[in-house]
């Protein structure tokens, strides 16, 4: 770690960091992680200061804009961090006195000459918003906050205090440091170093050692014996060895594969006697309705945001006589409506807490007290009525039109964007110009794609849900389903899509389930496609005027559940961006290598030589539909999002099993003459996974369409070959 710090930070920064540690009687050699954290904090403060300047009239300039005017410029930010504490306090008091403001109770990191405000800079390895509110509770409004995370997100109390270039530089530097640390296996050293009590090394006493020894699993006599077994175990090779012993008993007859041998997968998806596959995503997507409230773009607590939105739409908030439109099989509509009214009242009151009372209807909705009772094995053996439940096999469903409609709507362009990506610094090397140009085209397409708004809603909601599940395990909490969007004019809007209720969440294991009741707004009448909504209870709660037309507003209610793994994946849903962009960039790179120059613009817009690139993005009336490069990018991005939203064991199995079939088809297209054995067994493995997952069923439907086109194409090629032979 010492070598890493020396190589990655300037000598002056390291020296100041060591001086800071010395003031608190800390040894840099014993606490290298603390030295690293102080160096990072100092460097971020200097990056912010070095990027922003003021002229004599108080006008702001970035470092780039101020080139050639250096004599008339002065730094916008005074760096207080890194000074000896006595001098730092003296500087802080004199700045406060000079500008006629109150001296903060805590020592600040920066002072902004433009806004005349002190600033606290924070670096976190967790979520920026979490650390922001932690600091906010401590500092109040005494100073502005700038929080940056290694996770590539940030939270500012004043969005205008730092331009996009400055944010991008800071986040890029943090990413670079994290990558370097990970390469050298030093990143784990820093985990847990942030705002936690220091651990104390102590020798285990006899009692603790004895308790440790008797706590080991059955089959081990003591802890050391178990540790020795784990250290020496060979987890690999056992399956291979057993298979080798079985090889004389296995009989497989290879057969050369032909196009005629391939058939559509999952024939039951066309069976009209089966029910349509129902909508089972965690939150509404294309059917969502957000209550919009214009805002200045500052960070807000979710409860404040939800309260302001509900106040603007008071007719919906105060509705007490709903009309029941649809009821799910097991729902109690009266209990659900009472719970919704409790949620609204909790959000609307003046208290800071968003805790719900444990009423009988709240307990019913969250399943409180309905968990299985654990019984000792000895008791179960003696009781004849105790037996293992039969495994529940998912019911088969047929393909539904709503999946394709969702896909079409989510891949369209809208007038609003919710995607929050950090800006990057100015280009230096020629290859960076290419990267920036490519990024610009990609982001322009994705930014205003409906799917990116839905993705950010999922990210924010799952972040809040996981935080509340960990922080308030025994309490019922109301969690607003929110987002923030920016329109084409640059105006920010807070969006409230509904409210959710979290039940008790004593999640010891990653797969332990927490009940979540969701109440979401929509303008979609569920009776139009009733087969889509069997899991929902729907009320009509009023109407809104949109573009001069009155639209009914419906409240979609559902009792659902999730676990830690799903919540963590929800927080990282931004990963959908990477796969779609990498896939399209590979095509651009391939075209560029053929043409000998960067083809980014040519692929998206065309140039003097090449017309814009098009792709097959679907079918209509049995014919392939072509779309632009940008449309193809949005379609792939939307598919990645749907893959996350509907991800479960069925989808994992279908993806893995169908990959083999795709490889066989590719081999047939390349005329490599593939050989197979037990083709029907492979089909059986694929069809076992096609039950009631909407995305799996739709993927099977698309696969069958594509297989039909490929078969037709192969017949054309065969006829051409015959003509050539003659």
Curated annotation (Swiss-Prot):
GO molecular function: endonuclease activity; metal ion binding; RNA binding
Subcellular localization(s) per the UniProt record: Host cytoplasm; Host nucleus
Placement of sequence motif Nuclear localization signal 2 (NLS2): 183-244
Pfam families tied to this protein: Flu_PA
Cofactor, how bound (note): Binds 2 manganese ions per subunit.
Gene (UniProt): PA
Motif (Nuclear localization signal 1 (NLS1)): 125-140
Family statement drawn from the similarity comment of this UniProt entry: Belongs to the influenza viruses PA family.
Identification of the protein by name: Polymerase acidic protein
CC terms in the record's Gene Ontology section: host cell cytoplasm; host cell nucleus
Organism placement in taxonomy: Viruses, Riboviria, Orthornavirae, Negarnaviricota, Polyploviricotina
Keywords assigned: Cap snatching, Endonuclease, Eukaryotic host gene expression shutoff by virus, Eukaryotic host transcription shutoff by virus, Host cytoplasm, Host gene expression shutoff by virus, Host nucleus, Host-virus interaction, Hydrolase, Inhibition of host RNA polymerase II by virus, Manganese, Metal-binding, Nuclease, Phosphoprotein
EC number: 3.1.-.-
InterPro entries to which the protein is assigned, alphabetical: INFV_PA (IPR037534), PA/PA-X (IPR001009), PA/PA-X_sf (IPR038372)
């Amino acid at each position: 770690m010492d070598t890493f710090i020396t190589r990655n930070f300037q000598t002056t920064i390291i020296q100041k960091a060591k001086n800071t540690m010395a003031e608190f009687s800390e040894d840099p050699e014993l606490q290298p992680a603390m030295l690293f954290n102080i160096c990072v904090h100092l460097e971020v403060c200097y990056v912010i200061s070095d990027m922003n300047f003021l002229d004599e009239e108080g006008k702001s300039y970035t470092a780039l804009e101020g080139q050639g005017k250096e004599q008339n410029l002065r730094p916008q930010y005074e760096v207080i961090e890194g000074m000896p504490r006595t001098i730092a306090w003296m500087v802080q008091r004199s700045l406060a006195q000079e500008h006629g403001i109150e001296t903060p109770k805590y020592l600040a990191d920066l002072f902004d000459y433009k806004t005349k405000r002190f600033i606290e800079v924070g670096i976190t390895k967790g979520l920026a918003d979490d650390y922001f509110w932690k600091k906010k509770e401590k500092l109040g409004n005494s100073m502005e906050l700038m929080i940056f995370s290694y996770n590539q997100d940030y939270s500012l109390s004043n969005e205008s205090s730092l331009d996009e270039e400055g944010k991008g530089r800071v986040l890029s530097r943090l990413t670079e440091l994290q990558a370097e640390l990970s390469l050298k296996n030093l990143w784990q050293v820093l985990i847990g170093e942030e705002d936690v009590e220091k651990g104390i090394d102590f020798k285990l006493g006899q009692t603790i050692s004895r308790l440790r020894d008797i706590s080991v699993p059955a089959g081990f006599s003591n802890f050391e014996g178990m540790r020795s077994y784990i250290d020496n175990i060979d987890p690999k090779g056992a399956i291979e060895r057993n298979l080798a012993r079985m090889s004389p008993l296995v009989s497989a007859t290879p057969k050369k594969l032909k196009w005629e041998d391939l058939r559509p997968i999952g024939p039951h998806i066309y069976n009209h006697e089966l029910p349509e596959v129902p909508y089972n995503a965690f939150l509404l997507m294309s059917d969502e309705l957000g209550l919009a409230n214009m805002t200045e773009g500052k960070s807000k607590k979710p409860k404040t945001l939800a309260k302001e939105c509900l106040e603007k739409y008071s007719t919906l908030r105060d509705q007490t006589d709903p009309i029941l439109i649809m009821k799910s099989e097991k729902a109690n509509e009266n209990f659900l409506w009472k719970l919704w009214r409790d949620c609204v009242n909790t959000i609307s009151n003046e208290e800071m807490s968003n805790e719900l009372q444990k009423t009988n209807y709240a307990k019913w909705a969250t399943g409180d007290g309905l968990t299985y009772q654990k019984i000792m094995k000895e008791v179960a053996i003696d009781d004849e009525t105790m037996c293992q439940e039969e495994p529940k096999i998912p019911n088969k469903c047929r393909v539904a039109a709503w999946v394709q409609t969702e896909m079409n709507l989510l891949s369209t362009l809208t007038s609003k964007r919710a995607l929050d990506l950090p800006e990057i610094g100015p280009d230096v090397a020629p290859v960076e110009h290419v990267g920036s140009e490519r990024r610009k085209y990609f982001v322009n397409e994705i930014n205003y794609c409906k799917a990116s708004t839905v993705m950010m809603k999922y990210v924010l909601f799952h972040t809040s849900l996981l935080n509340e599940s960990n922080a308030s395990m025994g309490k019922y909490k109301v969690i607003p389903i929110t987002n923030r969007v920016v329109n084409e004019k640059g105006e920010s809007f807070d969006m409230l899509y509904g409210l959710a209720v979290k039940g008790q969440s004593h999640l010891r294991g990653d797969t332990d389930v927490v009940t979540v009741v969701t109440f979401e707004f929509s303008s979609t009448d569920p009776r139009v496609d009733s087969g889509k909504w069997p899991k929902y209870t729907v009320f009509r709660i009023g109407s809104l005027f949109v573009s001069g037309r009155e639209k009914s507003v419906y409240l979609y209610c559902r009792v659902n559940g999730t676990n830690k793994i799903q919540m963590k994946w929800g927080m990282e849903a931004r990963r959908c961006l990477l796969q779609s962009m990498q896939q399209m960039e590979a095509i651009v790179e391939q075209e560029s290598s053929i043409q000998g120059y960067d083809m980014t613009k040519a692929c998206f817009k065309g140039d003097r030589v090449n017309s814009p690139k098009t792709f097959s993005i679907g079918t209509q009336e049995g014919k392939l539909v072509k779309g632009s490069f940008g449309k193809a990018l949005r379609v792939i991005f939307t598919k990645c999002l749907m893959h996350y939203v509907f991800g479960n064991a069925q989808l994992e199995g279908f993806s893995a099993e169908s990959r083999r079939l795709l490889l066989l088809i590719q081999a047939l297209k390349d005329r490599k003459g593939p050989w197979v054995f037990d083709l029907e067994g492979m089909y059986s493995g694929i069809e076992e996974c096609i039950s009631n997952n909407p995305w799996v069923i739709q993927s099977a439907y698309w696969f069958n369409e594509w297989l039909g086109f490929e078969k037709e194409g192969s017949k054309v090629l065969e006829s051409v070959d015959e003509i050539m032979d003659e």
